[in-house]
Amino acid sequence: MHPTRLTRSLHLGVALAACASLNAQATESGVDNIGPGTDGFYVLPLSPDQLPEHMFAFNLYYNHYQARKLDISSFGGKVQEVRITSDAIIPRLDYLSPLRVLGGRLGGYVAQPYLRQQVSLYGQSDRRESMGDTTFAPIILWDMGPDLTLGAALEVTLPTGQYDADRLANTSNNFTTYKPLFSMTWLPSERTELSFKSTYSFNQENHATDYRSGQILHFDYSASYRLTDDLSLGLNGYYLKQTTDDKQNGKTVTFMGEDVSDGVRGQVFAIGPALHLRFLKYASAEIRWAKEFDVENRPEGDMLWAKLTIPFAL
């Protein structure tokens, strides 16, 4: 069971919080609780029905994100003097139980990030470092044979980090998100792997700003080739598309008194190389980088993920 969402995806939220004090515009345009790119190689374990009755996996993530571009309609277009840097360390614990639900095995996971945010915007800067928002989920895994596993979950992200609408940098988005999730890992051949995870976010209101971010469709993907028994190389990335408009005070978001015609809907596609190494028979480490393209109403930059996974049974 690989992670299916950590609450790290704050890189836009911290930037947008700046504008509450700088020009009284929308404070959260395009923010999400997804963490695009979290999942890469082997999103799900193969043959889950063959795993021990009480199976655990400890995952430790490191994430680095940096952006120098921000073009967003609620700020009138391109924003000058932008530099957004985010670093996160995210422990996550997975559990797979012997209980059966709808023909699959029931499990769950919980993730708690620790974040450091640095934001420079409109000539001002801020930095914050603390615990971030907590994510947890029940999940069901279906064993479809030795080469295919399917999964479904309901992720919940709670606003447990630090938030101040007058600060540029925050480690919380200050709203709850519910995310139905579907994931898959498939081995088309002995040496190839394809993994996919899709979520759909239902964001609740940030009561500090009376702002509600729109619903978001998102997926992570991975395609890899196993060079040796323990080493794989591949491509990874993510796609995110906001499907409904942002609202503030229950109304269309405005800029300079005029309604924003695109609803401040965010979009991004990212792709890049990845490496996966297995060691001590069942443990693994991976590193993945992705460059963002086709960005709308979000920062545009580069994303780096590193991950260590250690499975164990009790």
Residue ranges of model-derived segments:
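Cleavable N-terminal export/targeting peptides
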Residues: 1-38, 313-314
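Short loop/turn motifs that connect adjacent beta-strands in outer-membrane beta-barrel proteins
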Residues: 28, 46-55, 97-107, 121, ...
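Surface-exposed strand-loop-strand hairpins of Gram-negative outer-membrane beta-barrel proteins
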Residues: 28-36, 64-88, 122-127, 168-169
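Residues that define the transmembrane beta-barrel architecture of outer-membrane proteins
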Residues: 54, 83-91, 128-134, 172-178, ...
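Outer membrane beta-barrel transmembrane domains
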Residues: 67-71, 75-77, 210-314
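Outer-membrane pore/translocation modules
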Residues: 107-108, 113-206, 212, 258, ...
